[in-house]
Amino acid sequence: MEACPHIRYAFQNDKLLLQQASVGRLTLVNKTTILLRPMKTTTVDLGLYARPPEGHGLMLWGSTSRPVTSHVGIIDPGYTGELRLILQNQRRYNSTLRPSELKIHLAAFRYATPQMEEDKGPINHPQYPGDVGLDVSLPKDLALFPHQTVSVTLTVPPPSIPHHRPTIFGRSGLAMQGILVKPCRWRRGGVDVSLTNFSDQTVFLNKYRRFCQLVYLHKHHLTSFYSPHSDAGVLGPRSLFRWASCAFEEVPGLAMGDSGLSEALEGRQGRGFGSSGQ
C-alpha cells in the first residue's frame, strides 16, 4: 500500500479557528467579524503556510451563505509566503461575515503540465518555472464596467494530456483589482471565460495581457457525484472538485523556511498569492 502523501503546514492566527485538518482538506473558520465594503477587495490574512507533496498543487477557496464571492486560488509548489484569501462583496452596500459564517478550505490536487516548445495561441509558458498553471492571454482589448460580467471566448483547443482535464482558474493579481474569473472546464470546442468586475472603477485590460491560467487537473478530481470528499463551491454543481487524499503534517518552522524548503527560495518565494503576476 502506498504511503499517504503529506501536506506540510504551519498555522497561527487568533482570529481564525482550525476546525479540521483531516485526510484531504484543511478547514479554517472565522472567530471574529469580517466587514466587506462595497466595491472594495477584502483580503484575509490566514497565518497559514503550506507546502504540497511532490506532484501536487494546492487550492484555496472560501465558502459562506452570505452574498460574498471568494477567489479560488491556485497555490504553486514554489510559493513560500503566507496564504491569504481574496473576497469580493456582491452587494452595493456593506456585507458582514459574523463569527463562523466563513469557512476557508485548503486541499491538494494532482496535476500535469504539457510540453510546449513554444507558446500556442493565447496559451503561454508560466512566468515562474514550476508553476502549476499555464498563462492564458486575452485575444482582444477588454473593458469591464463596475459590477459588469463579460465572457471571453477562446476557440483554440488546448494541448491534451492523457487522464488530465484542462481547467480555467483566475489570477490573484486581477482578483486584487476586483476582477474575478469563474473557474470552468476548457473543452475541445472552446471555452467561454466569465469575468466579473466587483470594483468601483472601469477596468481596461489590454490585448495579450495574462488574464487567467490553465491548469491540468487529474481526472480523479472532477466528478458529477457528490461525496464527503468533494465540493461544489469550486467548479459548480455539474462538475465537483474532489481533492487528493493527503495527510496534513504540522511543521511549526515552515513559516521561517525550515524543513528543507531552501530549494524554493530562489524561485517564486512570497511573490503573489500563489499565482504569478500579482
Swiss-Prot record:
GO BP terms in the entry: dUTP metabolic process
Cofactor(s) needed for function: Mg(2+)
SUPFAM superfamilies linked to this entry: dUTPase-like
Keyword annotations of the record: Hydrolase, Magnesium, Metal-binding, Nucleotide metabolism
One Gene Ontology molecular-function label: metal ion binding
CDD domains in UniProt: trimeric_dUTPase (cd07557)
EC number in record: 3.6.1.23
Reactions that this protein is recorded to catalyse: dUTP + H2O = dUMP + diphosphate + H(+)
The keyword Hydrolase belongs to this UniProt entry's keyword annotation: yes
Pfam family, one: dUTPase
Top-rank EC class of the record's enzyme: hydrolase
InterPro entries registered for this protein in UniProt: dUTPase-like (IPR029054), dUTPase-like_sf (IPR036157), dUTPase_trimeric (IPR033704), HSV_DUT (IPR034745)
Residues at which substrate binds: R171, S172, G173, F273, G274
Similarity section: Belongs to the dUTPase family.
Function in brief: Involved in nucleotide metabolism: produces dUMP, the immediate precursor of thymidine nucleotides and decreases the intracellular concentration of dUTP to avoid uracil incorporation into viral DNA.
Protein name per UniProt: Deoxyuridine 5'-triphosphate nucleotidohydrolase
Organism: Epstein-Barr virus (strain AG876) (HHV-4)
